[in-house]
């Protein structure tokens, strides 16, 4: 890839470990696939990085052109001002300096990023991380009030993108197109599943994984991974696990991840006297997450909404049986009775029954339908759709 064909990613992350979630995961997959052919604009959590100018930064021993729009404290998960608003204002403020690098191809995956760059006249690839309106279930009380206005404004500007990708199933894509009220008429949204690193997320010996993590050999381990936020359904999963415990007394529920609801979850565990039955591990890296997955007997996900969930893909890639609620793309990942079960109603007793059924499935479960979406093919798949200039 020549100099003129480089790609600039602008995203509200440090491209290493903050903030956790699907945006960061996909950005890191892009880094893994494209390497230093990328230039990165985002935020930094390092005191050593300059802010407001381009500099050279090493990530995973690869040197990148990097532009830090702001410095963040990664230990603070509760913020007064929404990240989306901060991201929009930062891109607007630093826009000229960011674009001065002279790269024509820009990859975006956040709505507010596109709004801030809607008149930049560059070759934009916009990738929907999820197909729902992100403000409908905002943790900020005023977010819902602005949801329709925000999405309407976004739909009117998305026409500037040369290519539009959607990390969701066909139903979610069609629902999104209907919500655009004709603003996206005639535009193709290409279904583009999230990617996983199959060199890390693959079936491995359960006992060795437990020994490595110092986990009890005889316990039935239930696992969930990802951001600890209300829309991930942590309360529903804990309540369902309490029902599951009535039938599986030796069960242990491990929640891997961090997020704004960590303290709430810890308190809820204490109130229900589950401290010896539920383990909060905090943030873990990819290889350690893979070890937890391989050490587990069952993976659960209780989300209210998802795009194309990387965490669920990683679990299936490791051959772990799963039980999940109903959300976009779940039918493309879970094959009922083969690698897991989908519980359509948010009923804790029904979900616990689904967990019991999934627990009977033999490991490793079928996973070839998700391992085909490996990061090894990400670069080729994107460039098959996106003509760089």
Named regions from a protein language model:
Residues 304:
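Aromatic "clamp/platform" in nucleotide-sugar-dependent glycosyltransferases that forms part
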């Amino acid at each position: 890839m020549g100099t003129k064909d480089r790609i600039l990613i602008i995203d509200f992350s440090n491209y290493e470990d903050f903030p956790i979630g699907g945006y960061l995961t996909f950005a890191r997959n892009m880094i893994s696939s494209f390497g230093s052919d990328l230039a990165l604009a985002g935020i930094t959590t390092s005191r050593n990085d300059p802010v407001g100018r381009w500099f050279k930064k090493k990530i995973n021993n690869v040197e990148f052109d990097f532009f830090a729009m702001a410095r963040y404290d990664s230990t603070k998960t509760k913020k007064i001002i929404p990240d989306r608003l901060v991201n929009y204002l930062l891109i607007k403020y630093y826009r000229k300096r960011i674009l001065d690098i002279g790269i024509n191809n820009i990859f975006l995956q956040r709505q507010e990023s596109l709004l801030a760059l809607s008149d930049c006249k560059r070759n934009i690839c916009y990738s929907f991380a999820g197909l729902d309106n992100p403000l409908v279930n905002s943790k900020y009380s005023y977010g819902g009030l602005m949801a329709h206005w925000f999405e309407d404004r976004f739909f009117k500007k998305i026409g500037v993108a040369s290519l539009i990708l959607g990390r969701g199933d066909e139903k979610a894509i069609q629902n999104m197109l209907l919500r655009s009220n004709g603003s996206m008429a005639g535009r193709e949204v290409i279904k583009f599943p999230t990617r996983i690193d199959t060199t890390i997320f693959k079936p491995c010996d359960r006992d060795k994984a437990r020994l490595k993590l110092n986990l009890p050999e005889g316990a039935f381990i239930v696992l969930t991974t990802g951001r600890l936020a209300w829309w991930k359904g942590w309360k529903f999963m804990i309540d369902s696990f309490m029902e599951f415990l009535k039938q599986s007394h030796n069960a242990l529920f491990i929640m891997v991840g961090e997020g704004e609801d960590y303290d709430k979850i810890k308190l809820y565990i204490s109130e229900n006297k589950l401290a010896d039955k539920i383990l909060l591990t905090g943030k873990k890296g990819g290889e350690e997450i893979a070890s937890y997955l391989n050490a587990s007997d069952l993976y659960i996900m209780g989300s209210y909404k998802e795009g194309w969930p990387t965490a669920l893909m990683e679990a299936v890639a490791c051959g772990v049986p799963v039980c999940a609620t109903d959300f976009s793309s779940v039918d493309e990942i879970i094959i009922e009775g083969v690698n897991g079960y989908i519980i359509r109603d948010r009923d804790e007793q029904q979900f616990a029954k689904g967990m019991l059924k999934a627990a009977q499935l033999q490991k490793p479960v079928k996973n070839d339908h998700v391992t085909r979406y490996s990061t090894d093919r990400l670069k080729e798949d994107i460039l098959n759709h996106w003509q760089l200039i």
